[in-house]
């Protein structure tokens, strides 16, 4: 969505705190989101498979009361895959993998006058507030249908 909102923010003017307005995107709404899923199914041979990818663009993560001090979450990509083999006796074997790319969650404060003197790790000039990896997960299993 490309919706926005204008809110009051605080700003330092020398030693005084003043109020101004700032227009920003809606909280948590990415301007760009994409999903793609490829499926394969062979009922004759009992095979099913899927690869699914999704992209979520940069979005506002935490809103500050101060001008140009909001925390943003960088865009990220996720890739998942699954495969299943079914047998005529009702038994199925399956494997699933999630978050194959293990793209880190990157939260940052956008580069600007308030961050120019901050001595911290940066990404594209922005001050990194948090970087975390959620890891990949894998599952193997057996299923029996009566």
Kindly give the residue locations of the regions a language model identified:
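Extracellular loop and loop/strand-boundary signature of outer-membrane beta-barrel proteins
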Residues: 15-25, 65-70, 80, 125-130
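Gram-negative outer-membrane beta-barrel transporters
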Residues: 1-60
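Generic, ordered loop/turn and secondary-structure boundary motif
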Residues: 27-28, 77, 101-102
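Transmembrane beta-strands of outer-membrane beta-barrel proteins
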Residues: 36, 47-51, 81, 93-95, ...
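C-terminal beta-signal and adjacent terminal beta-strands/loops
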Residues: 55-63, 85-146
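Surface-exposed coil/turn segments at beta-strand junctions on protein surfaces, enriched
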Residues: 29, 42, 74, 86-88, ...
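Residues that define the transmembrane beta-barrel architecture of outer-membrane proteins
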Residues: 30-34, 75-79, 134-138
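Short, intrinsically disordered/low-complexity patches at protein termini
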Residues: 16, 71-73, 115-119
């Amino acid at each position: 969505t490309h919706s926005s909102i204008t809110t009051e923010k605080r700003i330092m003017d020398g030693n005084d705190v003043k109020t101004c307005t700032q227009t920003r995107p809606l909280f948590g709404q990415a301007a760009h989101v994409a999903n793609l899923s490829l499926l394969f199914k062979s009922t004759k041979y009992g095979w099913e498979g899927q690869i699914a990818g999704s992209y979520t663009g940069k979005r506002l993560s935490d809103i500050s009361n101060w001008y140009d001090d909001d925390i943003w979450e960088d865009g990220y990509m996720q890739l998942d895959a699954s495969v299943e083999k079914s047998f005529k006796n009702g038994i199925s074997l399956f494997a699933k993998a999630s978050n194959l790319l293990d793209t880190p969650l990157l939260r940052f404060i956008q580069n600007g006058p308030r961050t120019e003197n901050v001595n911290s790790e940066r990404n594209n000039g922005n001050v990194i507030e948090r970087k975390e990896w959620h890891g990949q997960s894998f599952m193997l299993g057996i299923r029996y249908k009566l």
